[in-house]
């Protein structure tokens, strides 16, 4: 989860988020090199007294500033396409959950189980227990097993919402009349927080998302207890 004064990303919990972090570092390094080169050229021009007023056409320079940006764009595009295809790929999910956005709460339905569905509301500040996080805790968490592919179907009952969990690299729009899907696989257990990431009305900031990722054995016990 995020911490006060944090400048970087949250710790990656899924393979997708790890790829996104690698791509971010890769792109940031390219931007740093380009910025350093441009700054060096600017400083060179400001400090040099040499002026070339008779140079109307330099074929070599034109080739360099045409070919070099093309190579840079290819170096950015290839890992970007790899990550995009990885995010869109769905390989035999073992569990499917339907997530519906409402003003202003989430509802979850485990479609592989009978009558396993619930609403998830934010816990108000005066109802928080010691150690719980303001504006991020909910009364019913989405519980999922770790190390297994899970498909999440996302839609909305009223207006536009967005179901987002940063540490898993997830952000999917919830659009009325449209069913979007995303796959997640967690590499470790824990509590992971997210929020609605689309302005959806007066209480937009009061739509937290809490994923509780547990080993498969505990998930089976939890689902069996709710089914009873």
Swiss-Prot record:
Keywords: Copper, Electron transport, Magnesium, Membrane, Metal-binding, Mitochondrion, Mitochondrion inner membrane, Phosphoprotein, Respiratory chain, Translocase, Transmembrane, Transmembrane helix, Transport. The modification Phosphotyrosine is found at residue 218. InterPro entries: CcO_II (IPR045187), CcO_II-like_C (IPR002429), CcO_II_C (IPR034210), Copper_CuA (IPR001505), Cupredoxin (IPR008972), Cyt_c_oxidase_su2 (IPR014222), Cyt_c_oxidase_su2_TM_dom (IPR011759), Cyt_c_oxidase_su2_TM_sf (IPR036257). Mg(2+) binds at residue 198. This is Cytochrome c oxidase subunit 2. Binds a dinuclear copper A center per subunit. GO terms for molecular function: copper ion binding; cytochrome-c oxidase activity. Its EC number is 7.1.1.9. Its cofactor is Cu cation. Residues 1-14, 88-228 are mitochondrial intermembrane. The chain crosses the membrane at residues 15-45, 60-87. Pfam families: COX2, COX2_TM. Belongs to the cytochrome c oxidase subunit 2 family. Cu cation A1 binds at residues 161, 196, 200, 207. Its main location: mitochondrion. Residues 46-59 are mitochondrial matrix. GO terms for cellular component: mitochondrial inner membrane; respiratory chain complex IV. Cu cation A2 binds at residues 196, 198, 200, 204. It is a multi-pass membrane protein. Component of the cytochrome c oxidase (complex IV, CIV), a multisubunit enzyme composed of 14 subunits. The complex is composed of a catalytic core of 3 subunits MT-CO1, MT-CO2 and MT-CO3, encoded in the mitochondrial DNA, and 11 supernumerary subunits COX4I, COX5A, COX5B, COX6A, COX6B, COX6C, COX7A, COX7B, COX7C, COX8 and NDUFA4, which are encoded in the nuclear genome. It catalyses: 4 Fe(II)-[cytochrome c] + O2 + 8 H(+)(in) = 4 Fe(III)-[cytochrome c] + 2 H2O + 4 H(+)(out). Component of the cytochrome c oxidase, the last enzyme in the mitochondrial electron transport chain which drives oxidative phosphorylation. The respiratory chain contains 3 multisubunit complexes succinate dehydrogenase (complex II, CII), ubiquinol-cytochrome c oxidoreductase (cytochrome b-c1 complex, complex III, CIII) and cytochrome c oxidase (complex IV, CIV), that cooperate to transfer electrons derived from NADH and succinate to molecular oxygen, creating an electrochemical gradient over the inner membrane that drives transmembrane transport and the ATP synthase. GO terms for biological process: ATP synthesis coupled electron transport. It is found in: Mitochondrion inner membrane. The gene is MT-CO2. It is an enzyme of class 7 (translocase). It comes from Loxodonta africana. The keyword Magnesium applies.
